């Protein structure tokens, strides 16, 4: 992982925690909930969990949840929410690109919500996810849609894998992310031993977005 990556999230942890789920009640995301399905009694990993909003969602659905993140400060906020309202969530600091803290076949499912595009090495991350999943396990993730940014878009370097600096009006997101063509995600999921089961494109809510999908969700199962 790039040296600046943990520091980038540590730097925005306070603003991030106050902007997203400040009361610690858990994420509300119908698409994610549908793709996850019934997780009652299942062992779940919330990958790149940040301050724990996705972990709290999974716990509210009846799962036994472990949250993992590279950022010390993000996990500090996650721990505060857990202490204030215990849900039985365990938080671990580790790198999503190797998940060295976890043994093989530790989890029934892995969820990575709006973070996969911020992790430098996709192939090693997907390989780590596959390693910690049990037979028949699944991986649900969401990303900023790699194809569209607005209802009118000039495509210049879509086919290139590259790091880019976001221009954001908010102070609670790191400035850097990694653009990858949709085909890269498909190819590397396949190489990691996954079969894509569902893809859901969610359009922008802004009135001027013209219904263009801004987010992409997917569920992949071990082939």
Language-model segments: which ranges?
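Conserved class I S-adenosyl-L-methionine
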Residues: 1-40, 53, 57, 74-77, 138-167, ...
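Class I SAM-dependent methyltransferase SAM/SAH-binding core
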Residues: 43-98
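Core SAM-dependent methyltransferase catalytic element
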Residues: 192-194, 207-223
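Short alpha-helix
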Residues: 176-199
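A short acidic, Gly/Pro-enriched loop at the edge of an enzyme's catalytic core
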Residues: 97, 101-110
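A short glycine-rich, Lys/Arg-flanked "PGG" loop and its adjoining helix->strand segment in the class I
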Residues: 123-138
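A short SAM/SAH-binding and catalytic strip from SAM-dependent methyltransferases
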Residues: 109-122
């Amino acid at each position: 992982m790039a040296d600046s990556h943990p520091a980038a999230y540590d730097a925005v942890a306070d603003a991030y925690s106050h902007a997203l789920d400040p009361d610690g009640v858990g994420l509300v995301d119908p698409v994610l909930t549908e793709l996850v399905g019934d997780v009652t009694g299942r062992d779940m990993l919330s990958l790149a969990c940040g301050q724990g909003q996705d972990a709290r969602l999974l716990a509210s659905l009846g799962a036994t949840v472990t949250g993992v993140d590279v950022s010390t400060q993000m996990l500090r906020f996650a721990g505060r929410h857990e202490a204030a309202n215990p849900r039985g969530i365990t938080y671990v600091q580790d790198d999503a690109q190797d998940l060295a803290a976890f043994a093989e076949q530790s989890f029934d499912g892995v969820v990575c919500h709006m973070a996969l595009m911020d992790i430098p090495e996709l192939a090693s991350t997907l390989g780590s996810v596959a390693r910690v999943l049990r037979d028949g396990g699944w991986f649900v993730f969401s990303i900023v849609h790699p194809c569209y940014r607005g209802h009118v878009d000039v495509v210049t370097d879509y086919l290139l894998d590259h790091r880019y600096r976001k221009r954001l009006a908010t102070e609670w997101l790191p400035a850097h992310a990694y653009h990858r063509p949709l085909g890269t995600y498909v190819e590397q999921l396949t190489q990691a031993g996954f079969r894509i089961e569902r893809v859901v494109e969610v359009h922008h809510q802004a009135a001027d977005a013209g219904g263009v999908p801004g987010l992409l969700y997917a569920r992949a199962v071990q082939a």
